[in-house]
Structures are given as C-alpha cells and as structure tokens.
Amino acid sequence: YFFSLFLVTVFVYKLLTLKKTPSKNLPPSPPRYPIIGNLHQIGPDPQHSLRDLALKYGPLMSLKFGTVPVLVVSSADAAREVLKTHDLIFADRPYSSVANKVFYNGKDMVFARYTEYWRQVKSICVTQLLSNKRVNSFQNVREEEVDLLVQNIENSCSKVINLTELLIEVTGNVVCKVSVGSGDKVDSYKILILEIMEMLGYSRSIEDFFPMFGWVDWLTGLRGKVAKAAKGVDDFLEGVLKEHLTARASNNASADNDFVSILLEIQEADAGSTMDNECIKSLIWDMLGAGTETISTALEWTLAALIKNPDAMLKLQNEVREIGKGKSKISEADLGKMTYLQAVMKESMRLYFTAPLLVPRESRQDVKFMGYDISAGTQVLINVWAIARDPSLWEKPEEFRPERFLNSHIDYKGFNYEYLPFGAGRRGCPGIQFAMAVNELVVANVIHKFNFELPDGERLEDLDMTAVSGITLRKK
C-alpha cells in the first residue's frame, strides 16, 4: 500500500514539474523506467549489477536512481580522470539521510560535504590522528591485542573456533583503545556499527533518491530505526566525552594519547576552532566505525582466502616461520622483510574489496568529462571491484594469486588506478598505514603460530566465499 501510494504521488509530481531541458551529450545509458530510472537494474550485489551493465554499455554509464543522476565508472582510465584530473570537481559527497542523522548534520570526515570545514577536519585527521608518527606510537596497543588473540586461539586449539568473532574482537579492541583509551567499550558500540553500516548501504532511504518524499521513510519505519541508532551512538559518545572531560578536570588524564584526548587538546588550544563537541564525537565515530568494520572484514577475507588456497598458505607459512624462527611471536620490525605477506595482503584486497564502490562522490559543478557533459550534483560511483577483476588489466583475475604482486610496482596508496582498495585523491582513505599495521601483524602472527583446517571434514570447495553487500563487502 505504502509503495503504491508513493508511486502515485511521484507520478503526479512528475507531471506537475515536467519541463524541457537542453539536450546534453551524456554517457551511454541502459533503458530506464519512468520515475524509478535504473533502480530496477541494481540487484542485491550492486558491484556485480554495475559490472554486468558496463560490459554492455561501456566503462562510463549514465544512470538515474530515482531523481538522482549517477555516473558509473568501470575502467582504470576513467577512474584516473575522476580521482586525479578532476579530483576537485568530484570532491563532494552526495546527501545521505542516514549519515546526516548519525554524524550530527555532516560533521564527520567520511560523509561530510566538501567545504572549508571538511578541509580543516581532514587536515586534523591526517596530521594529528593518523600521521606516521602517531600510528607508530600505538605499536604497543597492536602488539598487546595480537598477543591476546593468539592466546585465545591457543586456548581453543583442536576445537572449532569462530575466526570472525575473534577478528572483530581484536580489531575492535585496537581501534577502541586508540580512539577512546579503553578496549572495555567494544561491546557497547559493536552492534551499533553493524546496524548503521547496513543502513548506510547502497539500498538507501527513499529520501536519498526522491528528496521530496522523505516522509515515505517515516511510513516504512526506516526513519525511526535511524533515530534510535543515532541516539545510541550519541549516548555512547557523550559518555566517552564526559569521562575524558572529568579526568582532565581532576588532572587524572595522565599522558593520554587516545584520539579523544588529542581532539580535546586541539579544542582547548583554539576556542574559536571548528572542533566543538559534535565534531569530536563525529570524528571518533568515523574512527570506530570505519576502522573496526573495514579492518576486521579485510582480515576475515584474507584468512579465508589462505585457507581456501593451501599452496599460498604454505608459502606464507614458510616465509613467516623462517623469519620468525626462534621467536615466540612476530614483531612489527619483522614485517618489512615479509614480501610474500605483503603480496598476500594486496591480492586479498584486490579480490575482496571492503568498499567495492568506494564511498560515492558528487560533482560540484558542470564539467566536460571524457567528451561527455556531466552536470553539477551528479553522483559518481567508481566500481573498483570491477576494475580489479578486469581481464585486460589482470591475468586470470578471478584467481587468488599473490605472486602477481611480487616484483610489482602496484601499491595500495592511490597512485595505481587499476588497484584502489583505499580510494585516491582528496577523498582517499587517510588511514592506510593504521589499517595495514593491524592487518599485517595479525595475519603474520596467526600464520606463524597455527595451522588451520575446516571443521567436520568439510572440503576446500565447500568454504563459502559469498559476500554480503553493503557500504562494505562482508564475508557471508
């Protein structure tokens, strides 16, 4: 009933507002329906649907998601044009009703619009929170939590273990200690993260596709769910902030180095800065949400891929155990010697992108793009998942072959547009070093200590590598 009412309302609105627009030279487009545009062509795995459409209509496609014009990029050359040549023009973010509610009307770094406020916040994240020096200062936190992970696995040796839960726990503990100073709060925000990541996925609210009809989200109950989740986030973050402020007032904040303390110092040093309490809470939620979800997901895919490919597992075990011979554990100083480990991590992130379409961008102005007319306000989806499986760029792209990265110049830092696990340009992920420091240390120590088998006599071909799509690509 609600959906029928919605369609009738949109149809009437279209008739009343119909007007001629100058013809533009747009990229090729699949046939679209009135009102909904191309939404019916996007299945539960958007990266698959868009890749299949691109094979027919080309690496640049013009789509319509409801009233929203969308440019879909599915080639390395086109990705370079967006992320490098026209990076500033495509530096904005589209409006997201969910993100707007959760992140205090756009005060975070990931989803905020491209403004002077965003530039200041991004600078703080890059120079104060995620600099090489700062990431290195958290080495003890990483090593302590990885030691606990290894101990937990040892305590369950010869038993069936749930690696997913253990990886979420170790990642959550690292990110939580670094962000708020304590790993005890992981359980408080873990469920919230999963709920919000699901709501931020590509099956978004009606309001995002039809801004005039946001009331439909109220009828379907989505708005209530978002409000409840946003309140849970704020209650959690407000508690964290009050604890830190109380400790600082009583001079008990002894050499605190967590992100909340750093941001409070910035706030105190410049009372007129953009760093108000809502900004602090938004940035901390960015770190907690993006850090925990993406790192644990990448780790799960990597270990699953190694278990499913025993030849690669054996090569990595030989390398790690040779370098770690006579040691009880692998230290961060050892990681730089492990070339096959680095190749494994790169190959895992090529096949199993945690963000297969990156976070959508939006054009800030009209632009002539690769011969086509792209209007201001066009949403841009870069199908990095499809680019990384392009057979013209990668030999046997569907196979897990870490060897392809040995003696290769290709890296994950955003300069090779055939391989963009962290994005690139102004909107590229600033947490690359933080994420890889955790990823490599966890995998190296787990492989150093343990051999893995599937439970109950399962065969390798039975290992389910199905993905669950959302804003991140989690293993089923």
Curated annotation (Swiss-Prot):
<keyword id="KW-0479">Metal-binding</keyword>
<keyword id="KW-0408">Iron</keyword>
<keyword id="KW-1133">Transmembrane helix</keyword>
<dbReference type="InterPro" id="IPR002401">
    <property type="entry name" value="Cyt_P450_E_grp-I"/>
</dbReference>
<keyword id="KW-0492">Microsome</keyword>
<protein>
    <recommendedName>
        <fullName>Psoralen synthase</fullName>
        <ecNumber>1.14.14.141</ecNumber>
    </recommendedName>
</protein>
<dbReference type="GO" id="GO:0005506">
    <property type="term" value="F:iron ion binding"/>
</dbReference>
<dbReference type="InterPro" id="IPR017972">
    <property type="entry name" value="Cyt_P450_CS"/>
</dbReference>
<dbReference type="InterPro" id="IPR001128">
    <property type="entry name" value="Cyt_P450"/>
</dbReference>
<feature type="transmembrane region" description="Helical">
    <location>
        <begin position="1"/>
        <end position="18"/>
    </location>
</feature>
<dbReference type="GO" id="GO:0016020">
    <property type="term" value="C:membrane"/>
</dbReference>
<dbReference type="Pfam" id="PF00067">
    <property type="entry name" value="p450"/>
</dbReference>
<keyword id="KW-0560">Oxidoreductase</keyword>
<keyword id="KW-0256">Endoplasmic reticulum</keyword>
<keyword id="KW-0812">Transmembrane</keyword>
<keyword id="KW-0349">Heme</keyword>
<keyword id="KW-0472">Membrane</keyword>
<dbReference type="GO" id="GO:0102876">
    <property type="term" value="F:psoralen synthase (NADPH) activity"/>
</dbReference>
<dbReference type="GO" id="GO:0020037">
    <property type="term" value="F:heme binding"/>
</dbReference>
<comment type="function">
    <text>Involved in linear furanocumarin (psoralen) biosynthesis. Converts marmesin to psoralen and, with much lower affinity, 5-hydroxymarmesin to bergaptol.</text>
</comment>
<dbReference type="InterPro" id="IPR036396">
    <property type="entry name" value="Cyt_P450_sf"/>
</dbReference>
<comment type="similarity">
    <text>Belongs to the cytochrome P450 family.</text>
</comment>
<keyword id="KW-0503">Monooxygenase</keyword>
<dbReference type="GO" id="GO:0005783">
    <property type="term" value="C:endoplasmic reticulum"/>
</dbReference>
